[in-house]
């Protein structure tokens, strides 16, 4: 397994729409494993393949305290959503920035697991929010897209400054 490079805004590759996975095979499973390694290394709770410049419909999530409840979503589809909620969300592609984003309180999805088996999942709370956030990535949408243009601009400037400082270090 290896840690992949996470793309940061304003990288346009984050705006690409991911294509469905045709077949869950050893290559896809390796991508899933590398994505988990990357997510844990970056101390995230979710990661979409788009964020590591792989434009396929793959998501990995682990919202557990002990970091031992891996969830793999390949070709996820949103079946139902209900209620309203929101928390201050962060994103590995938008480092050190957070903003309140409106989300559905509960979701029901259909996806394939790491072995290609179909399943359905009903989620609420942090897991539901994380699923929606990561599914947005698969269609090229970022949490800042829910914000006003002024807030988007401020966040972009802060991330670009942070990336410049990190490049010098």
Curated annotation (Swiss-Prot):
CDD domains from the UniProt entry: Pep_deformylase
Keywords, alphabetical: Hydrolase, Iron, Metal-binding, Protein biosynthesis
Organism lineage: Bacteria, Pseudomonadati, Pseudomonadota, Gammaproteobacteria, Enterobacterales
InterPro entries attached to this UniProt entry: Peptide_deformylase, Peptide_deformylase_sf
Function: Removes the formyl group from the N-terminal Met of newly synthesized proteins. Requires at least a dipeptide for an efficient rate of reaction. N-terminal L-methionine is a prerequisite for activity but the enzyme has broad specificity at other positions.
Protein name in UniProt: Peptide deformylase
Homology family: Belongs to the polypeptide deformylase family.
UniProt remark on cofactor binding: Binds 1 Fe(2+) ion.
Binding-site residues for Fe cation, renumbered to this chain: 91, 133, 137
Active site per UniProt: 134
Domain of life, source organism: Bacteria
EC number(s) recorded for this UniProt protein: 3.5.1.88
Root EC class: hydrolase
GO molecular function, one term: metal ion binding
Keyword Heme belongs to the record: no
Catalytic activity: N-terminal N-formyl-L-methionyl-[peptide] + H2O = N-terminal L-methionyl-[peptide] + formate
Cofactor(s) the protein needs: Fe(2+)
Any one biological process term the GO annotation gives: co-translational protein modification
